[in-house]
Amino acid sequence: MKKSQEHGMVGRSGLKRVVQKDIGTRYRTNLKKMNIAIIGSQRYDSVRNIRDFIFNIRENLGVDVNIITRGNKDGCEKWVRKYALEFGLRYTEYNPAHTTRNLYSGMSDDYYDKPYHPTQILHQYDCVVKHSDKIFYFGGIKESEQKHFERLLVRFGKKVVYLN
């Protein structure tokens, strides 16, 4: 009588057949990688608040979190980048199309090195809102950008938490 092939046994072709067991629906929510957008004003300079906020994210959610910013080199997002990488979190930035692509850029290579256009700043908000699960905004936002930002939040059904 032939023995039936079970999990982990070597079959005729010499390859090991492995079947992944189901872990249940209760634990599936923990497997999803969370994308948290932390964006802010270029004049925001409270480094301690940003550092403590990112540290609390790491302590509460673990290191399987992706921090998303617009890639600004000044203000809040400069410190978000520094501390997200320092604490070992994944980091993605959606910098404007007129800049060069870097190691942490979220768009493809052909998106970058374009001539400057004023709507590129608004397109950053599109990318951030589209790719994030939670959005936190440090400091104030310009009125011209706020209208566009609020429309995007309504379109994608997301909410933002404004922090000072």
Model features per residue range: what roles?
Residues V18, D22-K33, Y44-N164:
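Acidic/glycine-enriched connector segments
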